[in-house]
Curated annotation (Swiss-Prot):
Catalytic residues as annotated in Swiss-Prot or TrEMBL: C209, H350, H389
Subcellular location field: Mitochondrion
Biological classification of the source: Eukaryota, Viridiplantae, Streptophyta, Embryophyta, Tracheophyta
Observed effect of gene inactivation: Slow growth and bleached leaf phenotype when grown under ambient air, but normal growth under CO(2)-enriched air. Thicker leaves due to enlarged mesophyll cells when grown in ambient air and associated with altered thylakoid membrane assembly and starch granule ultrastructure; these phenotypes are partly reversed when grown in 1 percent CO(2) atmosphere.
Regulation: Inhibited by cerulenin.
Domain Ketosynthase family 3 (KS3): 30-460
Name the UniProt record assigns to this protein: 3-oxoacyl-[acyl-carrier-protein] synthase, mitochondrial
Purpose of the protein: Catalyzes all the condensation reaction of fatty acid synthesis by the addition to an acyl acceptor of two carbons from malonyl-ACP. Able to elongate saturated acyl chains from 4 to at least 16 carbons. Uses malonyl-CoA but not acetyl-CoA as primer substrate. When expressed in a heterologous system, reveals a bimodal distribution of products, with peaks at C8 and C14-C16. The major product of the reaction (octanoyl-ACP) is required for the lipoylation of essential mitochondrial proteins. Required for mitochondrial fatty acid synthesis (mtFAS).
Quaternary context: Homodimer.
Tissues/organs with expression: Expressed at the same level in leaves, roots, siliques and flowers.
Transit peptide stretch: 1-28
GO molecular function: 3-oxoacyl-[acyl-carrier-protein] synthase activity
Entry GO terms, CC: mitochondrion
Length: 461
């Protein structure tokens, strides 16, 4: 009898599993995903309009690092001065604070002891994106069908340093009860979910500099597979502090040659590049199932039609010289979209201004797009010359730049390409001025330490 019941139970379980697989396949095949809202906080300013205008105009959000920027408030002056002196890189891309238009108002967004900067940036960007999408649901069912997928690269290192100092000073009882929830990367998603009552998937990718792209791509699949109808997705970061800058400096990842001329330090694809400029900020988009967006008359910026991922399986920080991981990510995004390489109008390159990484990505773009790239037909650029490298937020912010390129018909420029890398020639060359053009399709690349790669492909609709 027991055996018979077990067989019936297993048979029923298999039937339910088969139905689930069938349903999931159906969702993946038929549920299209579109972008209906945008929000950002960047070194170029708070808000999409301010950031985009300054980007297209060729402005730069990078400045020199100061002693106060190290976030060492509990340390004595001698230690602060010693630490600052030891840092080989003294440039960074900061979010502009203030109460004026285009500035980040900490009184509005950092008004709780439980909120670290990276969380505040994400909530601010999400608020702009949701208002842009006109999606602030009040019905319980709509909230249950709305999720959040906002990742981060590091969390709040400065809060960890301050907490460790309490141990050194034998003052552990002064440790804030908010310490743990303040530093956890997933708390950016958590705070957005709580603020708006969203009860769909609550997710946070942590994949170094590919985080923002993975968070958006994962959110797209959640909609495709029916887990949600709307997802608030993106990345956030605030890691300009003594320990983070020291750590990246020790790994020889940061620019050190342009401390006296900060706005020239981030120079993707240029021969004089010597490392990236650390930045901060957040980019968040509202993703929505296409029919759901149409029914409510939502403004649609673009469709997210391709998401490709890969692993280098090569080195902890450097890509392989042949760029195979980047090639696989771009190729897989193209395959999912059903588009051919010569149908892509613009590529927002990951290029961070590192000697190896930029050349490898340029080589990968030539491999994937072939004559379409080498003939000069394909437009491509790296926007990190203007923003610096926003680490976990980079993929999301640059996805927004790609979407805006489609929306406004302008491909943004690459700053500081004065002496192009030898891999380029007269036709195969990154944009050095913003270009008005018809952009029907745009790809955004994001690659991270550990050999993690992601490419997002957007198309007009």
């Amino acid at each position: 009898m027991a055996t018979s019941n077990l067989r019936r139970h297993l048979s029923a379980s298999r039937l339910r599993l088969n139905r689930f697989i069938s349903t999931s396949s159906s969702y993946h095949s038929h549920r299209r995903v579109v972008v209906t809202g945008l929000g950002m906080v960047t070194p170029l300013g708070r808000g999409v309009e301010t950031t985009w205008r300054r980007l297209i105009d060729g402005e730069c959000g990078i400045r020199g690092l100061t002693l106060d920027d190290l976030k060492m408030k509990s340390f004595d002056e001698e230690t602060k001065l010693y630490t600052f002196d030891q840092l080989s890189s003294k440039v960074a891309a900061f979010v502009p604070y203030g109460s004026n238009p285009g500035e980040f108002d900490e009184a509005l967004w950092l008004n709780s002891k439980a909120v670290a900067n990276f969380i505040g940036y994400a909530v601010c960007a999400a608020d702009e994106a949701l208002r842009d999408a006109e999606w602030l649901p009040t019905e319980e069912e709509e909230k249950e069908r709305t999720g959040v997928s906002i990742g981060g690269g590091i969390g709040s290192i400065c809060d960890i340093v301050e907490a460790a100092q309490l141990i050194c000073e034998k003052r552990l009882r002064r440790l804030s009860p908010f310490f743990i929830p303040k530093i956890l990367v997933n708390m950016a998603s958590g705070h957005v979910s709580m603020k708006y009552g969203f009860q769909g998937p609550n997710h946070a990718a942590v994949t170094a500099c590919a985080t923002g792209a993975h968070s958006i791509g994962d959110a797209t699949r959640m909609i495709q597979f029916g887990d949600a109808d709307v997802m608030v997705a993106g990345g956030t970061e605030s890691s300009i502090d003594a320990l983070s800058v020291a750590g990246f400096s020790r790994s020889r990842a940061l620019s050190t040659k342009f401390n006296s001329s900060p706005q020239e330090a981030s120079r993707p694809f240029d021969c004089d590049r010597d490392g990236f400029v650390i930045g901060e900020g957040s980019g968040v988009i509202v993703l929505e199932e296409y029919e759901h967006a149409k029914r409510r008359g939502a403004k649609i910026y673009a469709e997210l039609c391709g998401y490709g991922m890969s692993g280098d399986a090569h080195h902890i920080t450097q890509p392989p010289e042949d760029g195979k991981g980047a090639v696989l990510a771009m190729t897989r995004a193209l395959r999912q979209s059903g588009l051919c390489p010569n149908q892509i109008d613009y590529v927002n390159a990951h290029a961070t201004s590192t000697p190896i990484g930029d050349a490898v990505e340029a080589r990968a773009i030539k491999t994937v797009f072939s004559e379409h790239a080498t003939s000069g037909t394909l437009a491509f650029s790296s926007t990190k010359g203007a923003t610096g490298h926003l680490l976990g937020a980079a993929g999301a912010v640059e996805a927004i730049f790609s979407i805006l390129a489609i929306h406004h018909g302008v491909a943004p420029m690459t700053l500081n390409v004065k002496n192009p890398d030898p891999i380029f020639d007269k036709r195969f060359m990154p944009l050095t001025t913003s270009k008005k053009m018809l952009v029907r399709t745009a790809m955004s690349n994001s690659f991270g330490f550990g050999g993690t790669n992601a490419s997002l492909l957007f198309a007009s609709i």
